[in-house]
């Protein structure tokens, strides 16, 4: 998963 998946 990319950082964007965690909303960062």
Curated annotation (Swiss-Prot):
The modification Leucine amide is found at residue 8. GO terms for biological process: neuropeptide signaling pathway. Belongs to the allatostatin family. It is found in: Secreted. This is Carcinustatin-7. It comes from the Eukaryota. The keyword Hydrolase does not apply. The keyword Secreted applies. May act as a neurotransmitter or neuromodulator. Its main location: secreted. One of its GO terms (cellular component) is extracellular region. Keywords: Amidation, Neuropeptide, Secreted.
């Amino acid at each position: 998963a990319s950082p964007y998946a965690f909303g960062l």
